[in-house]
């Protein structure tokens, strides 16, 4: 099912999944699943760094502030012409699994996190959702 959030972000959900959104926040989940994804939306007003540097700094600040232990380095893919995606996985300070994605196409950024008590194959479904997201032009 193809959906729009606030006329500027498109995403697709598997059958039976739910999304709830208002303003600059969106929640996506499988009612019978293990975890949920929250997405917050931002706009860049002053860009004094490249887009990849900008989203890298955002992600690193989030990781530090929330005391997340990453399993490895953050990975950047995509292009600034379509969309850049920075992602990584780790555990929160209370030992929950977390995956984060920062999806960007200037001037918009979507910051998504998925959390569950433990890592399961469900995270692959969230990866698929993220891979099919787009910013409306």
Name each region found by the language model.
Residues 22-26, 82, 107-108:
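Beta-strand-connecting loop/turn residues
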Residues 2-57:
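Secretory pathway targeting signatures of secreted, lumenal, and periplasmic proteins
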Residues 12, 32-34, 80, 103-109:
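Short, solvent-exposed coil/turn segments at beta-strand boundaries
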Residues 17, 110-137:
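Surface-exposed amphipathic alpha-helical segments
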Residues 19, 28, 38, 98, ...:
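Short hydrophobic/aromatic-rich beta-strand segments that constitute the beta-sheet cores
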């Amino acid at each position: 099912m193809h959906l729009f959030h606030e006329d500027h972000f498109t995403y697709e959900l598997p059958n039976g999944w739910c999304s709830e959104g208002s303003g600059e926040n969106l929640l996506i989940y499988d009612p019978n699943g293990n975890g949920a994804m929250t997405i917050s939306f931002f706009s860049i007003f002053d860009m004094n760094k490249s887009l990849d540097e900008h989203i890298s700094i955002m992600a690193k600040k989030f990781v530090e502030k929330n005391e997340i232990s990453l399993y490895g380095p953050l990975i950047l893919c995509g292009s600034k012409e379509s969309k850049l995606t920075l992602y990584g996985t780790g555990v929160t300070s209370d030992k929950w699994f977390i995956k984060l994605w920062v999806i960007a196409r200037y001037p918009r950024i979507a910051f998504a996190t998925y959390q569950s008590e433990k890592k399961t194959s469900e995270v692959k479904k969230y990866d698929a959702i993220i891979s099919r997201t787009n910013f409306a032009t």
